[in-house]
């Protein structure tokens, strides 16, 4: 997320550590006072600046992401036009707080798309970014293999969030880390992961039937959310597209299916770690690559040389699909 409003520490040109407050909130003068008041949320509405020339989001993003024939990414950390103090700092400063724009939540519709030809998803992406009255809200890609690993090894994450919400994840992870720390002192490693996997193995299936059916039929999956203003046009396009392209299909999600589809995408992201931690005898480690595609890339399915692929147990592909 891009912002020009941040509170961060840096080492300046003279080699001195300094705290920079560009939050637009009057928190005092000294570093100790600023950080203490921020942590305690000790400030009034009148101390928060709302009229400012500083941006709290990227006001060019909606335009840039629509340029589907451009030969550069629309979203990547090394973009020199989107480097500003804390934004894009890549760990070179210590960020304590940022201010970001918020947007009104609108009524929306979720579509689940599957295909055995990645060209289908490319064509859909290009149409949705250039022809709808408003940009899609979200588009998440999951490959069949990532779907499988996520369904099995992200199940506890899925069920925990569904029951307790994302707000409680940090507390749960902190508790798990403490238990793991105690167990490692007596040379027991990965026991909590094994127990969680064993428990979830006996629990009922958590994913909607139509998603599971698409998992069996299709290699490539796209979870699409659009606002109500764009829903009818989106559905009409998908109907017409798949009427002449037999390599894929789609369905309009119920509210529950849409919620579970995006929750599954969230769980997929951490499932590889669980797989590693429960297969330490076979898995040396994970190589995680975050790749920014050019907006005009049509051949985005990775082809790994056989001499490298033979050393890989699994290749898991997932990501944000519209912001190449």
Regions from the PLM with identified roles:
Residues 99-102, 112-324:
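C-terminal substrate-recognition/cap domain of FAD-linked oxidoreductases
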